[in-house]
């Protein structure tokens, strides 16, 4: 399971290894600049991936970002249906609980 990298760690890398930091930052920009899928759709795919992996922190981050981008609860629910089929009930429940922490009563 992917682990969340604390902001302090990122700042240390940025200060001590600026070239490496830039490469990673540029890669993230490149990843979300799809030619056929817009950033919101790519992040919906990423939400499915991190939910399937059971990474609750990443589910919360992606849900928050998606909501900021205007994703609807219905779109997020559609993703969770796919997660249920692909990952099973335990991972589905874990992801839904994380989403509820971010979205509250909107679900």
Curated annotation (Swiss-Prot):
One Pfam family from the record: CMD
One Gene Ontology molecular-function label: peroxiredoxin activity
Taxonomy, superkingdom: Archaea
UniProt xrefs under SUPFAM superfamilies: AhpD-like
PANTHER family: ALKYL HYDROPEROXIDE REDUCTASE AHPD, BLR3452 PROTEIN
Protein name per the record: Uncharacterized protein MJ1511
């Amino acid at each position: 399971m992917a682990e969340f990298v604390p902001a302090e760690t990122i700042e240390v890398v940025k200060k001590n290894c600026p070239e490496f930091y830039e490469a990673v930052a540029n890669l993230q920009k490149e990843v979300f600049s799809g030619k056929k899928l817009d950033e919101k759709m790519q992040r919906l795919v990423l939400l499915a991936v991190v939910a399937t992996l059971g990474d609750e922190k990443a589910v919360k981050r992606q849900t928050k970002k998606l909501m900021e981008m205007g994703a609807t609860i219905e779109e997020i629910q559609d993703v969770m249906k796919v997660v249920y089929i692909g990952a099973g009930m335990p991972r589905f429940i874990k992801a839904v609980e994380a989403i509820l922490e971010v979205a509250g009563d909107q679900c």
